[in-house]
Amino acid sequence: MTSPKPIRTRFAPSPTGFLHLGGARTALFSWAFARHHKGVFVLRIEDTDVERSTDAAVQAILDSMDWLGMQPDEGPFYQMKRLDRYSEVLQSMLAAGTAYHCYSSPEEVEAMREAARARGDKPRYDGTWRPEPGKTLPAIPEGRKPVIRFKNPQDGVTAWDDMVKGPVSFDNNELDDLIIARPDGTPTYNFCVVVDDWDMGMTHVIRGDDHVNNTPRQINILKALGADVPQYGHVPMILGPDGQKLSKRHGAVNVMEYDDQGYLPEAMVNYLARLGWSHGDAELFSREEFVRWFDTHHLSKSPSQWDPKKLNWVNAHYIKAMDNAELAQRVAPRIAKRGGDASRADLADIMGLFKDRAETLEQLADDAMLFCAPFQAAPQELATQHLTPAAREALAGFAAAAAGTEWTREAISALIKAQLAERGLKMPQLAIPLRVAVTGRAQTPAVDAVLVLLGKDVVLERLKALL
């Protein structure tokens, strides 16, 4: 009895731009499927569009994959390094009669399509150069370089059981004889994909449903080569909050922009996973749980809707749950970028003070500057509003009593309560002036916690300077 064939999946982006959210989600599903089945996840860079492909886009794809924790088991492989292999397969297909040279000019092909439209038929190449038994082909036009077309079956049906959509079928007579090599000999996208999937032993292909129309053509080429046909799954697109196709007008679509904006990769993986896949009513789960639970049966057949508020909620959960020391390591570079002191020994404590109300690391870094940036006194308007003569008198009393007080949250809280009772004040009448006096802000976390982290000497020094 032979052992089952190991699962092999792939992600095959074109480096003509940065990795967008839809591509990242497709990669995530392919990666999780391979991990779930203890298979192999392959990264392939489809860079045959030489004019539009850039090294910067390749690096952005690699950086995005690394940030999301989707390291490939094999690759990256580059199509431009496989041109000799494509040429070899093209020649074998010409020799086998499954491909042929076509000398029709683009203008002639367009005329064929127009004629088909006029007849009410589907616009297509009419097979002028398609060799058939007993058929006489036209004379080869002088000086014209041919394309190579695949000799697609003209009858029957090409069908597959899609892992997401279910049964899908196309009548072969609806499929054109696809161009698989251009006049200069360079192979086309659909041909390269087929050869790559064949050579790399792909067993399952999960990709966007914009590829559905390519699939019957690719299946027929694979069959002509005598290759195994992978199982295909086509996931619906991601829509913006307005129900339109997700685009830049909805905000960031480049994955690494979310890193810049302070989203955790763990949160992004969680959110992307739930965008078109579900496991019961579970909203929050670890990467390990996602891999353990993932299966294609629970991929949605309907488009998903991008919800920035939901992403913020997920990110806030991961920030709250993260160890303060780990959080400090992740936020430190953002503090340094703002010119703050990211080397403070109490940075983890600062994270603990702010993280329960932070939705992003950027917000957390902004909050942390309260302690990590040089002190700036309150703006005049804020000082006028809150540092009244009565408030200054209360602050002077607090400062005098604080000089001999142990500097803990409990002791400071008790001191504030004692001052309130002694002066007949309510909490805001002392707490807000204290905040404004020692932080320059009217709103901060709990005032006793802020005072502890600032340190007794700093607090008394700032009060002395004010009074």
Curated annotation (Swiss-Prot):
EC numbers, comma separated: 6.1.1.17
Membrane-spanning residues: none
Residues holding ATP: 248
Localization terms from the record: Cytoplasm
InterPro entries: aa-tRNA-synth_I_cd-bd (IPR045462), aa-tRNA-synth_I_codon-bd_sub2 (IPR020751), aa-tRNA-synth_I_CS (IPR001412), aa_tRNA-synth_I_cd-bd_sf (IPR008925), Glu-tRNA-ligase_bac/mito (IPR004527), Glu/Gln-tRNA-synth (IPR000924), Glu/Gln-tRNA-synth_Ib_cat-dom (IPR020058), GluQ/Sye (IPR049940)
Reactions accelerated catalytically: tRNA(Glu) + L-glutamate + ATP = L-glutamyl-tRNA(Glu) + AMP + diphosphate
Cellular component annotations (GO), alphabetically ordered: cytosol
Coiled coil regions, renumbered to chain: none
Motif 'HIGH' region: where in chain: 13-23
Chief location bin: cytoplasm
GO molecular function, one term: ATP binding
Keywords carried by this UniProt record: Aminoacyl-tRNA synthetase, ATP-binding, Cytoplasm, Ligase, Nucleotide-binding, Protein biosynthesis
Motif ('KMSKS' region) on chain: 245-249
Keyword Acetylation applies: no
Biased composition (Basic and acidic residues): 118-133
Chain segments carrying region Disordered: 118-141
A biological process from GO: glutamyl-tRNA aminoacylation
Class of the enzyme per the UniProt entry, highest EC level: ligase
Subunit structure of this chain's protein: Monomer.
Role noted for this protein: Catalyzes the attachment of glutamate to tRNA(Glu) in a two-step reaction: glutamate is first activated by ATP to form Glu-AMP and then transferred to the acceptor end of tRNA(Glu).
Entry's family note: Belongs to the class-I aminoacyl-tRNA synthetase family. Glutamate--tRNA ligase type 1 subfamily.
Protein name per its UniProtKB record: Glutamate--tRNA ligase
Gene source species: Bordetella avium (strain 197N)
